[in-house]
Regions:
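Conserved eukaryotic protein kinase-like
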Residues: 1-217
């Protein structure tokens, strides 16, 4: 893809730093892609990507998100639409805790990984940063407890985002969605279609709050 992957742009390798509307657009595009895989529309039965992460979100010339690398994808056969027992594969930092402890792969395993990517979009940090101390390497563990605290939430916002590009209300809504996606129990997480709807609302809330127009795509 012409613009590389999402992690490149979040960690300063890409040619430009993304503002908040661009990040919301990418989150929404990725959510739609996962929702499509989960819906049975692609091949007639649900598909779990199993390795969704920021390096597998590619950006085209218009900064639209395209999901890549389906090498670990798993079909959920008829009669097993909720879960399938599978060897634990994926990328450290994006693993669904329930999947790693039980070996049962579900659509919600992708939702957890999607939540991690949402946190990367919000903070500009990596899912795992080995340059940090042992207790601060895992992004989810580092920020999960303050995602719904508006006062502390401000400290998590990527400083490379222009302050005029976001509203605190949209940030809070986005952080709340991310916090629910990375809940330990898979049954407590939203579905990908629900994520799509909530991100559309976050996008519109940000546009309305800023008083400007921006094409959602």
């Amino acid at each position: 893809m012409q613009k590389g992957n999402l992690q490149d742009h979040l960690n300063g390798i890409g040619e430009t730093k993304m503002d908040w509307p661009s990040r919301l657009k990418l989150a929404l595009g990725a959510a739609r892609g996962l929702a499509y895989l989960h819906s049975s529309s692609a091949v007639g039965i649900p598909i779990v990507h199993r390795d969704f992460k920021s390096t597998n979100v590619l950006l085209n010339a218009n900064f639209e998100a395209k999901i890549s690398d389906f090498g670990l994808a798993k079909l959920l056969p008829e009669g097993q639409e909720t879960s399938v027992t599978a060897r634990v594969l994926g990328t450290f930092g994006y693993f669904d805790p329930e999947y790693t402890s039980t070996g049962k792969l579900t659509l919600q395993s992708d939702v957890y990984a999607f939540g991690v990517v949402l946190l990367e979009l919000l903070t500009g940090r990596r899912a795992v940063d080995i340059n940090q101390g042992p207790n601060d390497q895992n992004l989810v563990l580092q920020v999960r407890h303050i995602l719904n605290d508006r006062k502390k939430l401000r400290k998590l916002i990527d400083p490379d985002m222009g302050r005029n590009s976001y509203t605190i209300e949209s940030i809070a809504m986005f952080a709340n969605l991310a916090s629910r996606c990375v809940r330990v129990e898979s049954g407590d997480r939203p579905s990908m279609p629900e994520c799509v709807k909530e991100l559309q609302l976050v996008f519109c809330t940000n546009v309305k709050g800023r008083g400007v127009g921006f094409r959602m795509g």
